[in-house]
């Protein structure tokens, strides 16, 4: 964890990502990438010389079988405010639009919902648990399923 925190700190400093008094939202899906991002930023704020806060946000998209109670417990342990937002993404994509290749529409709806939530909460910075492999995967999925190149 120390190595990861060192890398996160260096990245934040090199790119001047956090200013004094910022609130950084973390988009939390419940997957390992977003949870590591949340934990890293929550721990970083304890020793980082520039004061900032962390706020976790989960979009509850209506996907069957999803439960975020463990995320809520983790946020309490980390002393991080947690907002869960109900958005009808699953219903729109599968019931209304009946998409056969839902990835692009789902991603757009989630991004739009997340941006709206950030605006409503007055938060101007967000951290997502995406990495280079995610970008490659998205590029290949778009190429194979939609016949276009894009991320």
What do the predicted segments below correspond to?
Residues 1-149:
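ATP-dependent adenylation/nucleotidyltransferase module used to activate substrates
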